[in-house]
């Protein structure tokens, strides 16, 4: 791949290299062994567990909160099976509609108040009332009641196959009800603060610079070795790399292939590649603008050089997708063909579009350094067909706001599951009740698909669920709802001083800071 270095980036790198290395070397000596330094390209958008569906936010929220259940760690590896965290035991009725959870005594929020059944009810009622993305993981008619101070009951109106697993995801965080008593209200307060019972709490956030987390002195679990976690916001990947090399950072995220190649040659740096269910795809706005025409969507999908993206931009470190459900997730359909470029078909589909398609916009952010070259690849393919693609780069928070409103033609994003069920890829992507940032980012609506995916979610027979999801996949592929680009391993470079990191494919960008040591 030919690397393009922007003048301002080159200048910054030269200035950093010339002036900053000595400062970083001296700074690294001052970084305490009990402090973990993480480098990210962008601030969180919100820290409210009832609102965020962005793994970038979860680096802060996941360790700050606890949930009724959590993912097991087996032989040092993350598992998709769950075990009790705040819950000691649970029971379910024979029909799968009633679930009761007994809480462990002694858990406290970071202000010292008790974690009890009222707090659990408050948290889930709030999620369902706000109706943001996290609520899509739960049945919309679910009710939560307090049986006694340490017992909580969930009642569903229909069986819900992934229910127990959903209780481990970020949106199931148990929030201190005291958050509602802050003058600005719970929504405003929780967007920039934490109020949980996890091992760490947020103590400072200087936007665009750092987020600082310190131990929660009331945490009832094993005392962490780390005293502090500092997240540094550093937009330039080259600067994140240099700071990792020189000891000012312990972990860095979202690194392009050229920076990973440079890091691979440095002693003291370990690059972890973990099998992942994360997918990258193009959102095609099916509700308005030029992408509301299915022939126009097909032309965009057919114009893209998928192989060039994987081999050129990603250095071969990804595999093609053949539909919504990635390899490694049950209900994956190996009989489907991966997407591929076909300019002749694209030209024929464009000829069917009226009025003629001449201009499109491509919305992306600085969250992932690969997104811009992917956009340029799409631009080249469309240009050969007489379509002009305008590149529109936004701050990540601004882009997500636009996605939520459906204010775009074509946009790019990545998605990884929060629990081990195809629901994450089928119901979130296509259910008409979840349009926008919640998951259905192509704003798609098809009653036949709604029926299939909703039936699958309420069916306990796994074979039947596979059949229903695979039927739905064929329909949405024919409707050209998304362009499925690739499935890529989760790559995280870190200092070899960091010990005990546990990767879980349900928790990308979440670091087990309660058990990591240096």
Regions found by a protein language model. Give the residues of each.
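Append "and occasionally in soluble cytosolic enzymes with long acidic Gly/Pro-rich linkers
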Residues: 215-217, 265, 292-380, 384-385, ...
């Amino acid at each position: 791949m030919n690397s393009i270095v922007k003048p301002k980036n080159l200048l910054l790198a030269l200035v950093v290299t010339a002036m900053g290395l000595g400062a970083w070397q001296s700074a690294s000596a001052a970084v305490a062994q009990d402090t973990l330094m993480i480098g990210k390209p962008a601030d969180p958008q919100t820290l409210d567990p009832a609102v965020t569906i962005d793994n970038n936010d979860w680096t802060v929220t996941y360790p700050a909160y606890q949930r009724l259940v959590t993912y097991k760690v087996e032989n040092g590896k993350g598992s998709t099976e769950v075990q009790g965290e705040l819950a000691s035991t649970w029971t379910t009725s024979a029909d799968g509609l009633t679930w009761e959870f007994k809480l462990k005594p002694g858990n406290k929020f970071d202000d010292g108040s008790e974690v009890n059944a009222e707090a659990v009810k408050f948290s889930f009622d709030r999620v369902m009332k706000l109706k943001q993305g996290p609520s899509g993981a739960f049945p919309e008619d679910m009710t939560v009641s307090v049986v006694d101070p340490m017992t909580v009951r969930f009642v569903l109106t229909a069986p819900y196959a992934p229910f127990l697993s959903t209780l481990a995801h970020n949106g199931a965080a148990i929030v201190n009800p005291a958050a509602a008593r802050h003058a600005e209200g719970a929504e405003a307060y929780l967007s920039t603060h934490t109020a949980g019972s996890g091992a760490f709490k947020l103590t400072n956030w200087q936007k665009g610079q750092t987020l600082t987390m310190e131990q929660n002195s009331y945490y009832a679990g094993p005392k962490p070795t780390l005293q502090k976690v500092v997240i540094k916001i550093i937009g330039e990947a080259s600067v994140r790399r240099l700071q990792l090399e020189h000891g000012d950072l312990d972990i860095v995220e979202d690194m392009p292939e050229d920076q990973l190649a440079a890091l691979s040659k440095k002693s003291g740096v370990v690059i972890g590649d973990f099998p992942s269910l994360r997918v990258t795809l193009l959102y095609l706005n099916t509700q308005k603008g030029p992408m509301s025409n299915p022939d126009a969507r097909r032309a965009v999908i057919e114009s893209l050089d998928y192989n060039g993206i994987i081999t050129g931009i990603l250095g071969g470190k990804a595999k093609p997708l053949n539909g919504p459900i990635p390899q490694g997730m049950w209900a994956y359909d190996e009989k489907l063909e991966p997407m591929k470029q076909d300019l002749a078909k694209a030209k024929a589909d464009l000829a069917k579009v009226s009025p003629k398609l001449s201009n499109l916009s491509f919305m992306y952010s600085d969250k992932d350094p690969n997104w811009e070259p992917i956009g340029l690849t799409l631009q080249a393919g469309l240009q050969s067909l007489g379509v002009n693609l305008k590149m529109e780069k936004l701050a990540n928070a601004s882009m997500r706001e636009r996605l939520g409103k459906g204010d775009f033609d074509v946009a790019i994003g990545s998605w990884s599951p929060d629990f081990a069920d195809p629901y994450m890829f089928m119901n979130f992507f296509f259910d008409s009740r979840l349009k926008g940032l919640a998951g259905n980012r192509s704003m798609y609506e098809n009653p036949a698909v709604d029926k299939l995916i909703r039936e699958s979610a309420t069916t306990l027979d796994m074979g039947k669920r596979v059949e229903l999801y695979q039927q739905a996949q064929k329909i949405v592929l024919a409707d050209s709802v998304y362009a499925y680009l690739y499935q890529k391993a989760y790559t995280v470079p870190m200092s070899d001083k960091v010990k005990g990191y546990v990767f879980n494919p349900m928790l990308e960008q979440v670091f087990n800071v309660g058990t990591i040591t240096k």
